[in-house]
């Protein structure tokens, strides 16, 4: 026997048991209704009989003939029977209405109860009525609640576009500033100062500045004819500046050296940032261009002894040895 046949037999056995229980329940209900009717009729007749006797006694005063007594009793019994008939009709109507209401409630309860797991076949389940779908009510949202922390695609897209536009605007502004020309004062240092000026763009690197300085100085100094930018050092405010930095980097960040700001090109009237500075922007120290070979030979001698590589994260300031420059 296959599993499908076993399942069908189990289903049929359960169906027979349910039918048997329904028949027994109906028989019990009939017995209960029959008992109720019997008790109700007995009570009605007993109550009616007692009521008729009381009415007859109340209507007879003193000595009454037998015929009059029988007539009064007969009239009261006929009136009572008429009232009982009317009461049965109204009670039957009420019982019928209550039975219909009860059947309706049972029908609703049957169709709204939860459907449990069943091993019945699909064709047998289709015979049963489908449970009605109760639509879920949507709970309204409170407009006063802060929802800024929740993900919002429209807001995120708006912020992304705004950031991109600001970044593009910043890049355009930076490119425009990098193309601005500035005048840089520098001096070739070989133990003595040979000061010159050079016009250069803010976006140029220190290496490019050294290359242009070589072109201007090699006519006067023969040691620079075969020199390249890698053989030179750029010293500003006692700091050795790496070649990959641009002038714009120091102007924007307002980087400070040991004796003042590295580069200030805002206006000629600006006093140097440090409060203990004694010189104006126009008289600030020019940048020194030095051969590396000369520095290696003389780095123990002043002023090369005070030079050190530039570190962006380090804060530089005057020390007691710098007071001699005032």
Curated annotation (Swiss-Prot):
One of its GO terms (biological process) is chromatin organization. Disruption phenotype: Reduced growth and mobility. Larval lethal. Residues 97-109 have a biased composition (Basic and acidic residues). Residues 77-111 are annotated as: Disordered. It holds the Pfam family XAP5. Disulfide bonds: none annotated. PANTHER family: PROTEIN FAM50A, XAP-5 PROTEIN-RELATED. Belongs to the FAM50 family. This is Protein FAM50 homolog. It comes from Caenorhabditis elegans.
């Amino acid at each position: 026997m296959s599993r499908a046949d076993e399942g069908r037999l189990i289903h049929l056995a359960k169906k027979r048991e349910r039918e048997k229980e329904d028949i027994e329940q109906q028989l019990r209900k009939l017995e209960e209704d029959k008992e109720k009717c019997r008790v109700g009729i007995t009570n009605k007749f007993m109550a009616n009989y007692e009521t008729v006797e009381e009415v007859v006694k109340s209507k007879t005063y003193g000595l009454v003939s037998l015929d009059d007594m029988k007539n009064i009793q007969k009239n009261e019994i006929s009136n009572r029977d008429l009232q009982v008939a009317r009461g049965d009709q109204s009670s039957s109507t009420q019982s019928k209405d209550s039975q219909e209401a009860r059947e309706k409630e049972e029908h609703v309860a049957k169709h709204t109860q939860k459907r449990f797991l069943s091993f019945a076949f699909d064709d047998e389940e289709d015979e049963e009525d489908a449970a009605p779908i109760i639509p879920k009510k949507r709970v309204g949202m409170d407009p006063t609640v802060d929802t800024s922390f929740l993900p919002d695609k429209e807001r995120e897209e708006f912020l992304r576009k705004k950031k991109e536009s600001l970044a593009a605007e910043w890049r355009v502004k930076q490119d425009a500033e990098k193309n601005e020309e500035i005048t840089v004062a520098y001096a070739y240092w070989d133990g003595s100062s040979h000061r010159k000026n050079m016009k250069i763009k803010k976006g140029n690197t220190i290496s490019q500045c050294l290359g242009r300085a070589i072109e201007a100085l090699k006519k006067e100094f023969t040691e620079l004819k075969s020199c390249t930018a890698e053989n030179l050092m750029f010293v500003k405010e006692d700091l050795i500046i790496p070649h990959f930095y641009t002038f714009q980097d120091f102007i924007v960040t307002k980087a400070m050296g040991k004796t003042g700001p590295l580069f200030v090109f805002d206006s000629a009237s600006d006093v140097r940032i440090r409060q203990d500075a004694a010189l104006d922007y126009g008289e600030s120290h020019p940048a020194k261009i030095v051969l590396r070979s000369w520095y290696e030979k003389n780095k123990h001698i002043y002023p090369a002894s005070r030079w050190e590589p530039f570190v962006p994260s380090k804060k530089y300031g005057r020390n007691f040895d710098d007071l001699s420059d005032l």
